[in-house]
Swiss-Prot record:
Involved in the biosynthesis of the chorismate, which leads to the biosynthesis of aromatic amino acids. Catalyzes the reversible NADPH linked reduction of 3-dehydroshikimate (DHSA) to yield shikimate (SA). This is Shikimate dehydrogenase (NADP(+)). One of its GO terms (biological process) is aromatic amino acid family biosynthetic process. It catalyses: shikimate + NADP(+) = 3-dehydroshikimate + NADPH + H(+). CDD domains: NAD_bind_Shikimate_DH.
Length: 273
C-alpha cells in the first residue's frame, strides 16, 4: 500500500512542499502521496491524532507548530534538540521521531558553491524562527564570529547566548547599527521577513565586493531588493529557494533512506514561482 506524507501548518495553502515531494515520487516511481494539511495553532494535538489515524508515514512541520510540536515527539534527533524546533517527523507505527533539516538545508547551497565558512565573519539579520538553525550551522562549520542584528536587541541577545553556548563567538546590534559595516563581513544573511512585501534592503552594501557572499532566506519574490543591491556590488548571491530545496532534499532522504532526485525537485520548486 502507498505511503502518505504531509506538511502541517497554518496558513498552508501557499506551501510549495507538495509540488517538490510529488515530483520526487514521480521521478523515482515511488507509490507515495504528499498532502498539505491545515492545523490551526491551538489544535495541534487533535491534528496529530488525525494524521496517526490515516497512518501517515512522515510529515513536515511549518509555522506556527515548529516549537510546539516538540512536545508530541517520542524521540528526537540531535539536530532537533540543539535547535529546539522540529520541521520533519518520521512516524513508525505511530511512534514519532523529530528532526530539524533547516540547518542542513541552509548550509547545502554554501557547500555546493564550495564557500569557505571556517574562520569567516558573519552578519546575520534577524533573530526569529530560522535564525537559531542558521547560528547552529555556522557553529558547526567553525565560523570565526557572528554579529546578530535585529530590530529589537533582546531577541538578538538571546541568540548570542545560544551561539556562545555552542562555541561560536557572537555579538548583538540593532539593524540600524549595521550602518556602513557590511563590508567587514565575509557572509551576510537576511533571516528577517523583509523582502516578502518587496521592501527595500534593510542595510547598505557600501564597500561590499565579489568576495562577499550574500544569502537571503526569503524565497518569494525570488529577487529581493536585498539580493539586487548585493548583485550590483558583484557579490556571490544565494537565493532563498535554495535553502527550501536543501531542507526538502534532506527530509526526503530521512523518510526514504535514498538519495533525493535534486534536479527534479528543483524544477518542481521553480515551476511553483
Amino acid at each position: 500500500m502507498g505511503k502518505t506524507f504531509a506538511v502541517i501548518g497554518d496558513p498552508i495553502d501557499h506551501s510549495l512542499s507538495p509540488n517538490i515531494h510529488s515530483a520526487a515520487f514521480r521521478e523515482l516511481n515511488l507509490d507515495c502521496s504528499y498532502i498539505a494539511y491545515r492545523i490551526p495553532k491551538d489544535e495541534l494535538g487533535e491534528g496529530i491524532e488525525g494524521l496517526k489515524k490515516i497512518q501517515i508515514a512522515g510529515f513536515n512541520v511549518t509555522i506556527p507548530h515548529k516549537i510546539e510540536m516538540m512536545k508530541y515527539l517520542d524521540k528526537i534527533d540531535e539536530s532537533c534538540s540543539l535547535i529546539g524546533a522540529v520541521n520533519t517527523v518520521v512516524s513508525n507505527d505511530g511512534v514519532l521521531k523529530g528532526y530539524n533539516t533547516d540547518m542542513d538545508g541552509f548550509l547545502e547551497p554554501l557547500k555546493k558553491r564550495n564557500i569557505e565558512i571556517e574562520n569567516s565573519n558573519v552578519l546575520l539579520l534577524g533573530a526569529g524562527g530560522a535564525a537559531r538553525a542558521i547560528v547552529a550551522g555556522f557553529a558547526k562549520e567553525k565560523a570565526k564570529s557572528i554579529t546578530i542584528a535585529n530590530r529589537t536587541i533582546e531577541k538578538a541577545n538571546n541568540l548570542v547566548e545560544f551561539a556562545k553556548k555552542i562555541s561560536l563567538d557572537a555579538n548583538a546590534i540593532t539593524i540600524d547599527q549595521v550602518g556602513e559595516s557590511a563590508k567587514d563581513y565575509n557572509i551576510i544573511v537576511n533571516a528577517t521577513s523583509i523582502g516578502l512585501q518587496n521592501e527595500s534592503s534593510p542595510i547598505s552594501f557600501e564597500g561590499v565586493n565579489e568576495k562577499t557572499v550574500v544569502y537571503d532566506i526569503v524565497y518569494l519574490p525570488m529577487n529581493t531588493d536585498f539580493l539586487k543591491k548585493a548583485k550590483e556590488k558583484n557579490a556571490t548571491i544565494i537565493f532563498g529557494y535554495e535553502m527550501l530545496l536543501g531542507q526538502a532534499v534532506r527530509a526526503f532522504e530521512i523518510w526514504h533512506g535514498m538519495e533525493a532526485p535534486y534536479n527534479a525537485m528543483k524544477k518542481a520548486l521553480l515551476g511553483g514561482f
